[in-house]
Every structure is written in C-alpha cells, then in structure tokens.
Amino acid sequence: MASNDVRPVIKLRSTAGTGHTYVTRKNRRNDPDRMRLRKYDPVIRAHVEYREER
C-alpha cells in the first residue's frame, strides 16, 4: 500500500560523500524521475547537489 502512495517519503543524499541526508516527500505525478536539489551540507558547510536515494 505505501509503495503506491502518490507522495512517498524519499531520502536525499549528499553527492559530496559526507553521508548527510535530508528526508522529504515528493509527488510522483509531477516528478516521476529521481529528484536532484542543491541544498546545504552542514558537514562541509557548503551548498552541494543532493540526489534521491531509493
């Protein structure tokens, strides 16, 4: 049931290799592909790209 949810919970993992993650929800109908956002990584104290992890 949860796997067919329209707004599933996803993890956004830092591409800087620090292991830092953000947890958010996304709308599958509007964003069917993997999400990529530029967000702040507090480990390296800089903005880096975060990618959706499955």
Curated annotation (Swiss-Prot):
Alphabetical list of Pfam families matching this protein: Ribosomal_L33
Protein name: Large ribosomal subunit protein bL33A
GO biological process, one term: translation
Keyword annotations: Ribonucleoprotein, Ribosomal protein
GO terms for MF: structural constituent of ribosome
NCBIfam families (alphabetical): PRK00595.1, rpmG_bact
Sequence similarity: Belongs to the bacterial ribosomal protein bL33 family.
InterPro entries on file: Ribosomal_bL33 (IPR001705), Ribosomal_bL33_sf (IPR038584), Ribosomal_zn-bd (IPR011332)
GO cellular component, one term: cytosolic large ribosomal subunit
